[in-house]
Amino acid sequence: MQAFIRAHGIILPMNQDHVDTDAIIPQRWLVTVERDGLADGFMGAWRYDEHGQPRPECVLNQPAYQGAAIVLARENYGCGSSREHAVWAHQGYGIRAIVAASYGPIFHENCLKNGLLPVTLPAADVATLMAQALADPGCACEVDLVSQRVIGPDGRAYPFEIDAGRRQLLLEGVDDIDLALARAADIAAFQRRQQQDQPWLA
């Protein structure tokens, strides 16, 4: 997993509540178990019409937002069904962090496990950032995990909280599999003790 220290880039404003995982990565793109190759599916039904042509009104198709690195969203972002592809689609598109007022809980956890930083800010702060992003298309912000701050387009800093353990794993680029492998000896020792002390569980 790629370590996350900070991300600086263009803001992609998703100016509505309850953007669900079916919108983030529609079902027809869920034909793979691979992490790669999902960039085209990111917000696919919003980006393309029934003929596969780009919808010009979609922010993802507007020149100012090309190369965006940070999604700015409102309430309950990533709600709906559990699909890890929703996180992979963000990453495939080039998104490094999300700033939102709240998240679907499963999506939030999947983000942390895959190195996509989900920052939660008060709704009022999100509204301020959203107004700036919409007024100045293509403006940028910075998400700094070391200092736990979002730096808005105008230079204002917005502090955020994150679980200390998850923060450290993100900073080190360590996922749950890496963590388990690092503790393989301890796990094996526990299994041997358990087999000896509780053989009926074997």
Swiss-Prot record:
GO MF annotations in UniProt: 3-isopropylmalate dehydratase activity
Pathway noted in the entry: Amino-acid biosynthesis; L-leucine biosynthesis; L-leucine from 3-methyl-2-oxobutanoate: step 2/4
Catalytic activity: (2R,3S)-3-isopropylmalate = (2S)-2-isopropylmalate
Gene Ontology cellular component terms for the protein in this record: 3-isopropylmalate dehydratase complex
Domain of life the protein comes from: Bacteria
EC number from the UniProt entry: 4.2.1.33
Record key words, sorted: Amino-acid biosynthesis, Branched-chain amino acid biosynthesis, Leucine biosynthesis, Lyase
Biological role: Catalyzes the isomerization between 2-isopropylmalate and 3-isopropylmalate, via the formation of 2-isopropylmaleate.
Family listed: Belongs to the LeuD family. LeuD type 1 subfamily.
The protein's name in its UniProt record: 3-isopropylmalate dehydratase small subunit 1
